[in-house]
Amino acid sequence: MTPNEFFSIKYHILAKAELKAYIDKLADYLSQQSYLYHTLDKPIISDSDYDKLFRLLQDLVNDNPQFKPINSVLDRVGGEVLAEFETIKHKKKMTSLANVFSLEELRDFYDKIEYDIELECEPKMDGLAISIFYKNGKFDYAVTRGDGIQGEKVSENVKTIRNVPLKLNTSNPPEELEVRGEIILDKQSFLSLNEYMQTHENKTFANPRNAAAGSIRMLDSKVVAKRPLKLYSYGIGYFSKDFVHPETQFELMQLLQSFGFTISDNMFLAKNFSEVEEYHHKMSHQRADLAYDIDGLVFKVNNIKLQDIIGYTARGPKWAVAYKFPAEEVESEVLNVEFQVGRTGAITPVARLKPVAVGGVIVSNATLHNINEIKRKDIRVGDRVIVRRAGDVIPEVVKSLPQYRKSDAQMVEMPTNCPVCDSAIENVNDQAIYRCTGGWHCQAQTTERLKHFVSRKAMDIDKLGAKLIEQLVAANLIKYPADIYKLNFDQLTGLERMGAKSSQNVLDSIKKSKTPSLARFIFAIGIKDIGEVSSDVLANHFGSLESFRDAKFEELIEINDIGEIMANNIVSFWHDSLNIKIVEELLAIGIKIQNPVKVEHAYNESFTGKTVVITGSFENYGRTELTQLLKSIGAKVTSSVSKKTDMVICGDNAGSKLTKAQELGVEVILEDNLKDLL
């Protein structure tokens, strides 16, 4: 049918069965047009006709909700807001590829296979990995990679992506099929999204990858539906026995394209290593001109049977490898050096640069780490410098180019007083770190401490973001954590960009945070060097805030994961009258700390009461899953190896923890033996 034929039908006089058939036919037609437009880039109807037909379908379903078609284009507009994402297990482990960083290492991979082979070559998209499960050809659910064993179910968000098939384009779909791919934002869409975000929300994303990942993890799919995300498929995971698997990887990708998935235009079949080198050379030079960001190339053995023979490690397939591009480096000029103050008072020099594009992002600031690094690299204001950015790493100044140095270039000196509060700056034990001594009296430290206090792993006041904290501090509405709980509706609505609904959401979020676990509360109050894991250890050991507050140094250093420096910091924290006042104000204003419940663990001869460290990756367990399993049988799982450690459970690619365990004579358990002990 054509658009005009759909419009010509007098649907308002149709019988119920006829109306349902008309709605189904219209939904199928729109799905086909969406596929032609978003996947094949070959539309056959105008945007105007598509929009009119889409509105017609919406109106018909609104008037006749009992006839709403399953997995139609209507599902792309988003649904109800979720409270949280469900965690579900992958039917087939979602592994990672081994990395190589040079052509020599890529040649080693090729030679180890010991066959004359073809390699299927493709760009390595820099986005969010996703797995989409289809049942009898219809979209069932979508899940993120997570830890490879399990991930977050993000079905409603993924359904909004225009080029994700809601039905497979085949008359004979397999009973079950899991399709895997990368969700991305192309460069132009990213720039447009950031312009919108800057105008409407006064914030932007750092890069397209963060934008894609952040969008998919939003709880409101209606917002996600407005984001120009795109899926590129790169393979399959689990499939039922009735799936007719092609003989080669290249043919598999063509099959997925016929099902309705978008695949890369830059896929290539290399018949020998010489062609692999040619592809590498071509893509390295075309990288900057691609519509989307890539951070490397992927090479897969083309023959599927040969893939099965070559096999897998616990981490991933031995028949595929990812070539990672070297960190991108460009030249820029240091316009100025400013000093930022962090949550603990640490002073960090930051170079203000002449804006330059690097790694897909416009960079105008770069870290200089500390004053010792500045002196070692001899970086001066006015210098031309090399700036590097790799992945999500904060851009850094690698080195200066003294051959271009101007005569008026200025050396950088560490200030003696805080640039924010004018308190003295101290250097303890002649280390590289200098700190402002102002504490809560320094507005910069106050702001960062309050950001930490409300953060997701602390008090989890999710509607109270970093920008709003900055506004509240600048307006003198909050100075200490308890002030957050004194905020009222009028104060919030009086701030820029804060309407009635947003203000009420903030107040609801604050109220919801009043019953934190003891571990969250310890983490939130910001004791120096006490992170999330240490807070959990301390909460479980002491059981209450009162016991923790009264802890002596001698008791603290006996606790696994708590060393002398951390113990000293804890004792010093509770000897500071201002810290005690801050905590008491929080308790007085209604914070009800939930103490950990003592759980009776199942007894296990090998693990109950033992201190265990996990290192490496495992074939049959995710790290989170294994940690929870060990805790359930009474083991204490810690993050570092020490003399107090009873055993180290070791998977593939174990690093320094295994070395330290061997040096200390700590028992090492391999995954092969773990199942018997459990």
From Swiss-Prot:
InterPro entries the record matches: BRCT_dom, BRCT_dom_sf, DisA/LigA_HHH, DNA_ligase, DNA_ligase_CS, DNAligase_adenylation, DNAligase_N, Hlx-hairpin-Hlx_DNA-bd_motif
Keyword Nucleotide-binding: no
Gene name tied to this protein: ligA
Protein's organism: Francisella tularensis subsp. novicida (strain U112)
Source taxon at top rank: Bacteria
Protein name: DNA ligase
Any one GO BP annotation for this protein: DNA repair
Organism taxonomic ancestry: Bacteria, Pseudomonadati, Pseudomonadota, Gammaproteobacteria, Thiotrichales
Catalytic-site annotation from UniProt: 124
Limits of the BRCT domain: 602-678
Binding positions for NAD(+) per the UniProt entry: 47-51, 96-97, 122, 145, 182, 300, 324
SMART domains with a match to the protein in the record: BRCT (SM00292), HhH1 (SM00278), LIGANc (SM00532)
Any one GO CC term of the record: cytosol
Cofactor dependency: Mg(2+); Mn(2+)
Binding of Zn(2+), residues: 418, 421, 436, 442
Substrates-to-products reaction catalysed: NAD(+) + (deoxyribonucleotide)n-3'-hydroxyl + 5'-phospho-(deoxyribonucleotide)m = (deoxyribonucleotide)n+m + AMP + beta-nicotinamide D-nucleotide
EC number, UniProt record: 6.5.1.2
Role noted for this protein: DNA ligase that catalyzes the formation of phosphodiester linkages between 5'-phosphoryl and 3'-hydroxyl groups in double-stranded DNA using NAD as a coenzyme and as the energy source for the reaction. It is essential for DNA replication and repair of damaged DNA.
